[in-house]
From Swiss-Prot:
It comes from Pelagibacter ubique (strain HTCC1062). F-type ATPases have 2 components, F(1) - the catalytic core - and F(0) - the membrane proton channel. F(1) has five subunits: alpha(3), beta(3), gamma(1), delta(1), epsilon(1). F(0) has three main subunits: a(1), b(2) and c(10-14). The alpha and beta chains form an alternating ring which encloses part of the gamma chain. F(1) is attached to F(0) by a central stalk formed by the gamma and epsilon chains, while a peripheral stalk is formed by the delta and b chains. This is ATP synthase subunit delta. It is found in: Cell inner membrane. It comes from the Bacteria. InterPro entries: ATP_synth_OSCP/delta_N_sf (IPR026015), ATPase_OSCP/dsu (IPR000711). PANTHER family: ATP SYNTHASE DELTA CHAIN. The lineage of its organism: Bacteria, Pseudomonadati, Pseudomonadota, Alphaproteobacteria, Candidatus Pelagibacterales. F(1)F(0) ATP synthase produces ATP from ADP in the presence of a proton or sodium gradient. F-type ATPases consist of two structural domains, F(1) containing the extramembraneous catalytic core and F(0) containing the membrane proton channel, linked together by a central stalk and a peripheral stalk. During catalysis, ATP synthesis in the catalytic domain of F(1) is coupled via a rotary mechanism of the central stalk subunits to proton translocation. One of its GO terms (molecular function) is proton-transporting ATP synthase activity, rotational mechanism. Belongs to the ATPase delta chain family. Its main location: membrane. It is a peripheral membrane protein. Coiled coil: none annotated.
Length: 185
């Protein structure tokens, strides 16, 4: 029996793998991946949609009506819409964020991509981001899927994380290290 009584990563993985296999079979993988990312962004950006998903008092009909409207507005792939309807009918829509994130991650892994996080103190141009991505691709001998964030609190420098490897050249980190040495002394 599972120690985790909640909806586990394994369960999310099963649903996402099922969606992946259906998408491959229907030859719509790229479209469904893009639409899944759109749904993830909608969950992040819309408090109303997040509430509809997370509030257990919302009934299936309300969720299905909202899904229908979202499907029309975003012109979602029919297979993805049916999959999301299935989640609603099985009372698993509460976990749609985990499931779709797992699906997008599965797509990346199947393409042989490594996920990388880049955070910089200054806004980087598209060209600078692409140059960093190319260097990471060379260094890790793998295709890189790069997520970029700007964080002025770093003061200067970059933080790059690929898998479990992290390089932090930020001034904020250097100041923190100096502070720690002074406390220890």
């Amino acid at each position: 029996m599972s120690k985790n009584k909640g909806f586990s990563e394994t369960s999310a993985g099963r649903y996402s793998l099922a969606l992946y296999e259906l998408a491959v079979e229907a030859n719509n993988l790229n479209e469904i991946e893009v639409h899944s990312a759109s749904i993830i962004n909608l969950i992040t950006s819309s408090e109303d949609f997040k509430s509809l998903i997370k509030d257990p008092t919302n009934n299936k009909e309300d969720q299905l009506n909202a899904l229908s409207k979202i499907s029309e507005q975003y012109k979602l792939n029919e297979l993805l819409t049916k999959f999301l309807s299935f989640l609603i009918s099985k009372r698993r829509f509460f976990y749609v964020d985990k499931i779709l994130k797992s699906f997008v991650e599965t797509c990346s892994v199947k393409r042989g991509e490594l996920k990388a996080e880049l955070t910089s103190a200054k806004d980087l141009t598209e060209n600078e981001i692409n140059n960093i991505k190319e260097e990471l691709t060379k260094n890790f001998s793998s295709k890189i899927k790069l997520n970029y964030k700007h964080d002025a609190s770093l003061i200067g420098g970059l933080i790059v994380q690929v898998g479990s490897t992290m390089v932090d050249t930020s001034i904020k980190n250097k100041l923190q290290q100096i502070e720690n040495r002074m406390i220890e002394a």
